């Protein structure tokens, strides 16, 4: 009965899909739902790629770029949390690590902080207990130009509801 239930479940489908994609038993993943495993499989033929991680949060926990970093990729990690970026500066010191907000304009904005390192820190206020903090903001175009990034192979955007403003700030025809 248990085996029958497992085979008919959504989890069994995911298990089989992972097994097919990796052609082996599932290994450790860093992303919350093993997205990094899929990303790594898709990009496996690119040896020294470049990633841009907007809303990077943590260099290990939940990271969708750590596997790429371990394969000698490099990139830009951007987060509104100074504490998060300080962790990246220690663990990924060859990457470009920026403490700023990515928006559809250059200047300053405010973000709302739950705690110094928290996945829910956001440009969008979700509760009245959050601290309001002023921060520099730039478009992705400006950031890439200032850091002389001419192209990138992987873009990860996880900014708690402000993704559209990030996308508005990049010229995809250029990159």
Q: Model-derived features: where do they sit?
A:
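Phosphate/nucleotide-binding beta-alpha loop and adjacent structural elements of enzyme active sites
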Residues: 1-175
């Amino acid at each position: 009965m248990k085996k029958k239930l497992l085979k008919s479940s959504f989890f069994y489908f995911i298990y089989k899909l992972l097994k097919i994609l990796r052609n082996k038993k599932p290994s450790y993943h860093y992303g919350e739902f093993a997205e990094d495993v899929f990303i790594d499989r898709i990009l496996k033929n690119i040896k020294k790629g470049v990633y841009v991680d907007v809303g990077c949060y943590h260099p290990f926990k939940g990271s969708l770029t750590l596997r790429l970093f371990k394969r000698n990729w490099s990139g830009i990690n951007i987060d509104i949390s100074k504490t998060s970026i300080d962790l990246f500066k220690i663990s990924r010191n060859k990457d470009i690590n920026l403490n700023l907000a990515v928006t559809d304009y250059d200047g300053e904005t405010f973000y709302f902080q739950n705690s110094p390192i928290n996945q829910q820190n956001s440009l969008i206020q979700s509760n009245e207990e959050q601290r309001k903090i002023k921060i520099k903001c730039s478009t992705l175009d400006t950031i890439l130009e200032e850091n002389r990034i001419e192209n990138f192979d992987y873009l990860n955007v996880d900014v708690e509801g402000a993704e559209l403003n990030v996308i508005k700030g990049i010229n995809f025809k250029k990159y």
